[in-house]
């Protein structure tokens, strides 16, 4: 099951879930991509998102406005839907309208092999890595996440040296091996790191839970600001959304 948590009052770009992406609301575009891989449900926090989904025949459920993270919203949706404890759950973002089908499939495969949860990352350049809106991740020898940050990591102390490892940009999608793991993560107390960086995945690392990271090739970009949307619409065309 794929669940897309959709919050109307985003702090950086209010109402972005309903922004038009080549004739479809952003969240609907995301859901149509997800439906190419598995059954998808949008976990809404507002009737306006529900109505937009229903208009385009996208399955949706109404959840609380008071969740601290998209993961918590996914759990409520899973409970409303009555998912079985052993069912895998993918958490895709409602602000990734250009995410390729192959990336979702890669996440699904990684989730099957991950003991706890999985996510994806892609190689980025130095200039991209400077943006705090693009989260960076560093990995251990088994491709498990060591840390996620809005800062540039790993930091290259010797400026004239050549990087030995690529810079990795996190793609904010998650796969949980089963519903019970989703429940386990949400039951953990929030930690100071996730609050400092505003990155919910740091809760798992703080409590020593493994996050397997699948490195993928992707041209997708998350839409965090109005400027992101304007730039994306210049880069992408409707034909590219058929990938």
Curated annotation (Swiss-Prot):
UniProt record, GO biological process: CMP-keto-3-deoxy-D-manno-octulosonic acid biosynthetic process; lipopolysaccharide biosynthetic process
UniProt main location, coarse: cytoplasm
Pathway, per record: Nucleotide-sugar biosynthesis; CMP-3-deoxy-D-manno-octulosonate biosynthesis; CMP-3-deoxy-D-manno-octulosonate from 3-deoxy-D-manno-octulosonate and CTP: step 1/1; Bacterial outer membrane biogenesis; lipopolysaccharide biosynthesis
Enzyme class: transferase
InterPro entries assigned to the protein according to its UniProt record, in alphabetical order: Cytidylyl_trans (IPR003329), KdsB (IPR004528), Nucleotide-diphossugar_trans (IPR029044)
Cell compartments where the protein resides: Cytoplasm
Record key words, sorted: Cytoplasm, Lipopolysaccharide biosynthesis, Nucleotidyltransferase, Transferase
Claim: Transferase is one of the keywords in the record: yes
SUPFAM superfamilies in UniProt: Nucleotide-diphospho-sugar transferases
Record GO terms (molecular function): 3-deoxy-manno-octulosonate cytidylyltransferase activity
Pfam families referenced in this protein's UniProt entry, alphabetically: CTP_transf_3
Catalytic function, reaction form: 3-deoxy-alpha-D-manno-oct-2-ulosonate + CTP = CMP-3-deoxy-beta-D-manno-octulosonate + diphosphate
Gene Ontology CC: cytosol
Protein family: Belongs to the KdsB family.
Its job: Activates KDO (a required 8-carbon sugar) for incorporation into bacterial lipopolysaccharide in Gram-negative bacteria.
NCBIfam families associated with the record: kdsB, PRK05450.1-5
Protein name, UniProt field: 3-deoxy-manno-octulosonate cytidylyltransferase
Biological source species: Helicobacter pylori (strain J99 / ATCC 700824) (Campylobacter pylori J99)
The organism's taxonomic lineage, starting at the top: Bacteria, Pseudomonadati, Campylobacterota, Epsilonproteobacteria, Campylobacterales
Gene: kdsB
